[in-house]
Amino acid sequence: MLGLPNELSGSQVPGATEYEPGWRRVFKVEDLPGLGDYHIDNQTAVPTSIVCVIALAAAMDISNGKQANSIELYDVTIGRPIHLGTSPVEIETMIAIEPGKDGADSIQAEFSLNKSAGHDENPVSVANGRLRMTFAGHELELLSSRQAKPCGLRPVSISPFYDSLREVGLGYSGPFRALTSAERRMDYACGVIAPTTGEASRTPALLHPAMLEACFQTLLLAFAAPRDGSLWTIFVPTQIGRLTIFPNSSVGINTPASVTIDTHLHEFTAGHKADLPMIKGDVSVYSSEAGQLRIRLEGLTMSPIAPSTEKQDKRLYLKRTWLPDILSGPVLERGKPVFCYELFGLSLAPKSILAATRLLSHRYAKLKILQVGTSSVHLVHSLCRELGSSMDSYTIACESDSSMEDMRRRLLSDALPIKYVVLDIGKSLTEGDEPAAGEPTDLGSFDLIILLKASADDSPILKRTRGLIKPGGFLLMTVAATEAIPWEARDMTRKAIHDTLQSVGFSGVDLLQRDPEGDSSFVILSQAVDHQIRFLRAPFDSTPPFPTRGTLLVIGGASHRAKRPIETIQNSLRRVWAGEIVLIRSLTDLQTRGLDHVEAVLSLTELDQSVLENLSRDTFDGLHRLLHQSKIVLWVTYSAGNLNPHQSGAIGLVRAVQAETPDKVLQLLDVDQIDGNDGLVAESFLRLIGGVKMKDGSSNSLWTVEPELSVQGGRLLIPRVLFDKKRNDRLNCLRRQLKATDSFEKQSALARPIDPCSLFSPNKTYVLAGLSGQMGQSITRWIVQSGGRHIVITSRNPDKDDLWTKELEQRGAHIEIMAADVTKKQEMINVRNQILSAMPPIGGVANGAMLQSNCFFSDLTYEALQDVLKPKVDGSLVLDEVFSSDDLDFFLLFSSISAVVGQPFQANYDAANNFMTGLVLQRRARNLPASVINLGPIIGLGFIQNIDSGGGSEAVIATLRSLDYMLVSERELHHILAEAILIGKSDETPEIITGLETVSDNPAPFWHKSLLFSHII
C-alpha cells in the first residue's frame, strides 16, 4: 500500500479504532525543511496541497488492505492557510476520518482536518469534506485519454510566471516550482512537469504535494498572463468539487516520465457578487506519452486570502477634462471691472469658493492654500475632498490660540492633512520684521488665500494678505454685504473694492459672486500681480517685461476665409512687438526661408486647409522644416474636435514632436470659429512668448505655459487628464464591493460592471476590420461569449488557420474571414454587400488596422508618414462612409495611449491615432455612434506575447514599465471594449483612455513633464 511518509501523515491517535482512525502531527519549520519552499506574503506556510495529500494518504488506511483503483475527495472546503513562523512555534494538525458508507466495491466517508497552536487553543478547521474509494477492477475504464488541446495556446516563459506569482505574495521554490513549460490563452492553460531527480523525487508518495500545487498554479495561469495585473492579490484554493486520483499511477514529481496538466477556467465570480471573488475551473493530469488520465480536479475554486482594499484598486481608466480658465470669461477693460453673476451657478458663498477653487486647481495642480479665518467644517472638508492630491498643503490661520484649538477640535475626526497657525492678519509687517510665534514664515509662497469675513475696504489687511501670496497667486475673499454700501449702489461699491485691491498689488475684482438668496455676502476673486503677470493677463494693455526686437513669423492666409483674420492678427501684434513680423502664406514657402533667427512662429495654416488632408510632398517638407527648426510655435487649429479630424491628426503629430524635443515649446490652440477670435489668438501668441521668457528666468510666479488650449464660445478652456472614477469603480468592483458615489458622496447602489450580454445580439453582424490576429480572435471569442453569433473579420492577408473559427462555430457562431483592404472603398463596399446578402444586418464596426514605422521626427520621410496614416486615416474614413447608413450599435476605432502622451519617435503613428479621435467626435456631432479607445500595451496578446518564447518580452515589459505605461490584460481589454461601446452613444466625450501607471518608483518619464498629466502623478 502506498501512502505518505510518516513525517507528513503523523501517527495514529491513541484510542482510535478501525472505523474511527485519526492522526496527529506537529509541524515545525526546522523539522520539515521542504515546507520552506512555499511562502505566502513572505511567510513560510503549509501548502494547501499537503492538506489534500494527507487526506488522500489517510484514506488508504481505512481500505482494510484492499488495493484501491481510485480515491476521490469531494465537497472539500479548505480554510485559511497555515503559516509557520521561523521561531520554534508548534502548530498541531489533526485529521479524523469518520466512515460513512462502505461495501465490497467502495467505501465512502467524511473527513476533517484541524489545527491548534497549543494546548489551550481550540482546534480550528483547516479542511473538511467527503471521500470515496473504489476497489473494483475497472481502472482502464477510468483512465480516459487526453482530449485535443484548445487552439490558440501561446507559450509562457516559466521564470517570469513564477516571478509574477512572487510579486503578489505567492513564493514557490524547490520542488514546488515544478512546471518546466507552459502554454496559455485566456481561461485555458497547459503545463508540463518533466522527470525530476534529487531528494524530492525519492519520496515514495502517493501524490507529491508539488504535483497538486502545480495544478493550482495552472488555474492561476489560465486566469492571468504573467504580470498582466489580473492577479492582483494572493489566491489560494478554498473549495474542491472533486479530486480523483488513481493510486496505481503513482503520479508525483518522481514520475519516470513527464506529465501534462490541462486546465480550463470556466467561472469567475466578481467581488461585487460575493464576499470574495472566486475563480473556478477543472484540471486534468495526463501522462505526456500515453495521454492517459492520472488526476482529475473538478470545481477547483480559488479565492483571495483576504478582502481587497482600495489600495489594491487599479486606476486603469483616465479621461480628458476641459474646464475654463477662471479668468478667461469677464476681463478688465481699461481698468474697469466687468462682472459675472452666474459664473459658478451656485447660490451660497461656500459653494462659490468651492467652485472657484476647483477651476484654479484644475490649471494649477499642487496648490499651496492658506485659509485666513475660521469657517464651517463642511467648507474645509469639501475643499480637501474636492482637491484631493491636487492640493500640496492646506493651512488654516486663526486669530488666536483659542480659535485655533476650536477649529482643530471640530476637524479632528476628519483626519484631514491640515496645518494650523495663529495669524493676526491685521498686523502690518514691514521688511525685516519677524512674524510672531506661530505665524507662517513662508511669506510670498502661497498660491491661494481664502480670506473669510473680510472688510472690503481694509487696505492694511489686503496689503498683508498680498505679502503672503506669490505673484500670479489668487485671493478668494468673502465680504458681508452689510459692511459695504447697500446693493442699490453696488456699481460704486465694486469700483471702490477694485481700486483698493489694485492699490495693494492685486489685479482688482476679476470675478464677483453674490448670494442671490439673501444678499448677505459676496465672494471676490483677485490675482496677485507684478509687471510680468500684468503682461500675461493683458498683453495689449501692458508693457512687455522682455525685449521685443526679435523676428516673429506668421504662417497662413492662402485662403480667402482666413486672409482677413490673419491680417488683423498681424496688425494686432505690431501694437506690442517692436521687431520684424514676417507673413508667409503657406508651409511650402518655408523651403526658401531659414528659421534660425525667428524667435517664435504663429502657424495659422490650418485655418486655410487641414495640413494632413491631401498632404503634398512640398507641404510635408515645410511642416518638417517648421517643427524641426523652430523654438517656439503656436499651432492654431479650427474645430479639430468635431469638424476637421485631419487637424486632430496634426495635433497628435505635434504632441510627439514636443515629447521628442523637450527644449522646444509647441503650444496647440483650437478655435471654434475663424472670425471673431483674432484678438484672442494674438493675445495667446504674446502670452506664450511671455510665459516662456518668464519660465526661462528665475521667477517663482504662479503661471503655466499650457501645452494645449481650446476656445469655445469666447472662453479659454484648459485640458487635464484625470482619473475616470466611474469606470474605475466598474472595473474594481470585480475585485471588491464598493459604493457608487456622486461628487457630494451621496451613496447609491453598489458599483456594477457593464453586462456585455446587453451589448450584442444574435441577430446582427459585427465587422472587425484589420483584426484577424490574436487580439481580433480574443475580441471575437468575447463577442460570441456575450451573445453575438455573426462576425466578419477583414484583413489584407488573412491567416489560413481556421481552427479557432471552427471552435467557435461548434458553439453556434458564424465566423467569416474575408480578404479586403480597409483603405480601399470598393473592397469594403463588396464586404458590406456580401454581408447584407447572406447574413443579418450590420450592428457594429471596428477598425483595428495599423502599421508602425518608428523613427526620429527629423528622420521621418513623406513615404513613412503616408504609409502609417493609411490604415487608420483612410481606413477609418472608408468605414465611416461605407457603413454610415447602417443602424450601428457601435463604431469603434482602436487608437493608442501614445497619441495621448505624444510618444517620441512615433509622430506618424500618433498623427494617425489622433485623427481617429477627431473622426469619432465628428461622427458624434452627426449623431452617429462612435468611440475611440486609446489602449495601453496589451500583455498576453499580440506583440509582447509573440516575443515571449525568446525571453524578449521581459526586456519589452521592463522598458514599458520604465516609461510608466500600465500593462493591460486581456480581461481588461474586454472590459474596455464594453465601456467603449456604451460611451459611443452617450452624451460623454466618446474617448476611452487607458494605460498610464500613476504610482511608480521609476525616474519620471517624458510624459510626466506635461501639464496635461499634473493631476495623476
Swiss-Prot record:
<dbReference type="InterPro" id="IPR036291">
    <property type="entry name" value="NAD(P)-bd_dom_sf"/>
</dbReference>
<feature type="region of interest" description="Ketoreductase (KR)">
    <location>
        <begin position="532"/>
        <end position="720"/>
    </location>
</feature>
<feature type="domain" description="PKS/mFAS DH">
    <location>
        <begin position="6"/>
        <end position="311"/>
    </location>
</feature>
<protein>
    <recommendedName>
        <fullName>Stereoselective keto-reductase af490</fullName>
        <ecNumber>1.1.1.437</ecNumber>
    </recommendedName>
</protein>
<dbReference type="GO" id="GO:0044550">
    <property type="term" value="P:secondary metabolite biosynthetic process"/>
</dbReference>
<dbReference type="GO" id="GO:0006633">
    <property type="term" value="P:fatty acid biosynthetic process"/>
</dbReference>
<keyword id="KW-0560">Oxidoreductase</keyword>
<dbReference type="Pfam" id="PF14765">
    <property type="entry name" value="PS-DH"/>
</dbReference>
<dbReference type="InterPro" id="IPR020807">
    <property type="entry name" value="PKS_DH"/>
</dbReference>
<dbReference type="InterPro" id="IPR049900">
    <property type="entry name" value="PKS_mFAS_DH"/>
</dbReference>
<dbReference type="GO" id="GO:0016491">
    <property type="term" value="F:oxidoreductase activity"/>
</dbReference>
<dbReference type="GO" id="GO:0004312">
    <property type="term" value="F:fatty acid synthase activity"/>
</dbReference>
<dbReference type="InterPro" id="IPR042104">
    <property type="entry name" value="PKS_dehydratase_sf"/>
</dbReference>
<feature type="region of interest" description="C-terminal hotdog fold">
    <location>
        <begin position="153"/>
        <end position="311"/>
    </location>
</feature>
<dbReference type="InterPro" id="IPR049551">
    <property type="entry name" value="PKS_DH_C"/>
</dbReference>
<dbReference type="InterPro" id="IPR050091">
    <property type="entry name" value="PKS_NRPS_Biosynth_Enz"/>
</dbReference>
<dbReference type="Pfam" id="PF08659">
    <property type="entry name" value="KR"/>
</dbReference>
<feature type="region of interest" description="N-terminal hotdog fold">
    <location>
        <begin position="6"/>
        <end position="138"/>
    </location>
</feature>
<comment type="function">
    <text>Stereoselective keto-reductase; part of the gene cluster that mediates the biosynthesis of fumagillin, a meroterpenoid that has numerous biological activities including irreversible inhibition of human type 2 methionine aminopeptidase (METAP2). Within the pathway, the keto-reductase af490 acts as a 5-dehydrofumagillol 5-reductase that stereoselectively reduces 5-keto-fumagillol to 5R-hydroxy-seco-sesquiterpene. The pathway begins with the conversion of farnesyl pyrophosphate (FPP) to beta-trans-bergamotene by the membrane-bound beta-trans-bergamotene synthase af520.</text>
</comment>
<dbReference type="InterPro" id="IPR029063">
    <property type="entry name" value="SAM-dependent_MTases_sf"/>
</dbReference>
<comment type="pathway">
    <text>Secondary metabolite biosynthesis; terpenoid biosynthesis.</text>
</comment>
<feature type="region of interest" description="Dehydratase (DH)">
    <location>
        <begin position="8"/>
        <end position="306"/>
    </location>
</feature>
<dbReference type="InterPro" id="IPR049552">
    <property type="entry name" value="PKS_DH_N"/>
</dbReference>
<dbReference type="GO" id="GO:0016114">
    <property type="term" value="P:terpenoid biosynthetic process"/>
</dbReference>
<dbReference type="InterPro" id="IPR013968">
    <property type="entry name" value="PKS_KR"/>
</dbReference>
<dbReference type="Pfam" id="PF21089">
    <property type="entry name" value="PKS_DH_N"/>
</dbReference>
